[in-house]
Amino acid sequence: AAGGLLAWARRRPVLAGVLLGLGAATKLYPLLLLGPLFVLCLRTGKLRPFAKTAGATAATWLVVNLPIMLLYPAGWAEFFRLNSDRGADPDSIYNVLRSFVGWPNWAPSTLNLVSLVLFAAACAGIGLVALTAPRRPRLAQLCFLVVAAFLLTNKVWSPQYSLWLVPLAVLAIPHRRALLAWMTVDA
């Protein structure tokens, strides 16, 4: 994911897409970075580089995944089945709220919908701010916000997910003290 952002910064949209596609083939979160790229390209009116990046991302993801999808369809789909059938992790915001508010355990399908709606609403808010801000936000700032929104609204929380935010935080948070404070609290 970080390599994809670097390639984008160096104005190499196809390479950015290939690197994001490879990242997405191992863990889906690099796909989240396409949203901020789209919003910034929309803001500047330059959608062609985004189209190249998105196309290269999809093509790379397919090249990596298609053989496994065709040869071992049940094994390939297991990740998606597991994630759609699982409930809230003990460390997720939903489980924390449930323990304080006394919410009942939600069925996985309900939790999936709630998580998706909250994440989509957060992304819409981030996109609106990005499109209407007086100064164009930096890509790393938007990526940090989108990935953080995904982690906060997701029903699954693993401590290693914080590592997804580290390179984005280093690029997005300009003040070292604020960055170190965030990293200390997160640890």
What are these regions (language model features)?
Residues 174-187:
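C-terminal multi-pass transmembrane helix bundles with aromatic-rich, positive-inside signatures
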Residues 1-5, 29-32, 57, 143, ...:
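Alpha-helical transmembrane segments of multi-pass membrane proteins
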Residues 68-98:
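Extracytoplasmic catalytic-loop and juxtamembrane helix elements of membrane-embedded
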Residues 86-153:
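Aromatic/glycine/proline-enriched transmembrane-helix motif characteristic
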Residues 158-177:
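Hydrophobic/aromatic-rich transmembrane helices and adjacent perimembrane loops
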Residues 32-59, 70:
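Perimembrane helix-loop-helix junctions
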Residues 2-15:
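Membrane-interface transmembrane helices that cradle and orient dolichyl/undecaprenyl
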Residues 14, 18-40, 63, 152-161:
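Transmembrane helices and adjacent periplasmic/lumenal helix-loop junctions
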